[in-house]
UniProtKB/Swiss-Prot annotation:
Homodimer. It is an enzyme of class 3 (hydrolase). This is D-aminoacyl-tRNA deacylase. The keyword RNA-binding applies. It catalyses: glycyl-tRNA(Ala) + H2O = tRNA(Ala) + glycine + H(+); a D-aminoacyl-tRNA + H2O = a tRNA + a D-alpha-amino acid + H(+). Keywords: Cytoplasm, Hydrolase, RNA-binding, tRNA-binding. GO terms for molecular function: D-tyrosyl-tRNA(Tyr) deacylase activity; Gly-tRNA(Ala) deacylase activity; Ser(Gly)-tRNA(Ala) hydrolase activity; tRNA binding. A motif (Gly-cisPro motif, important for rejection of L-amino acids) lies at residues 137-138.
């Protein structure tokens, strides 16, 4: 499972003209699910997302986690993170999970996030989404579990 974390001042995701998820300060995470991923992969990723120190303390050092700043978590599924781009000029998606597994694991990740953290929003799995964000830093990390 891959999670591309971006620290944001705010972010929102729309499907058509409807806003389906939005946060103020926090992290936007694009989630890519692969065939070998399990609930354990999702649990490991969630632990990293909630506890990784990406926010600045009073001295300007990245010493604070999402939990410590009470920031928002916006999860957006993105199967293209599992793309194979090693050869040719067109991505291959054989390394992406099948839609049924992807939906199951994304829903699990989202449900566990809502249990563990007070401010959680999400995009719509499988939808054509427009993601708007104000990147803060920019600070971006790629996690692979």
């Amino acid at each position: 499972m891959k999670g591309l974390l971006q620290r944001v001042r705010s972010a929102r995701v729309e499907v058509g003209t409807e806003v389906v998820g939005a946060i103020d300060q926090g992290i936007l995470v694009l989630v890519g699910i692969e065939p070998q991923d399990t609930r354990a992969s999702a649990d490991k990723l969630l632990h990293k997302l909630l506890n990784y120190r990406v926010f600045s303390d009073a001295d300007g050092k990245m010493n604070l986690s999402l939990r410590e700043v009470s920031g928002g978590l916006l999860l957006v599924s993105q199967f293209t993170l599992a793309a194979d781009t090693k050869s040719g000029l067109r991505a291959g998606f054989s390394k992406a999970a099948a839609p049924a597994l992807g939906a199951e694991l994304f829903d699990y990740l989202l449900s566990q996030a809502r249990i563990a953290h007070p401010v959680v929003a999400a995009g719509q799995f499988g939808a054509d989404m427009q993601v708007h964000l104000i990147n803060d830093g920019p600070v971006t990390f790629l996690f692979e579990t």
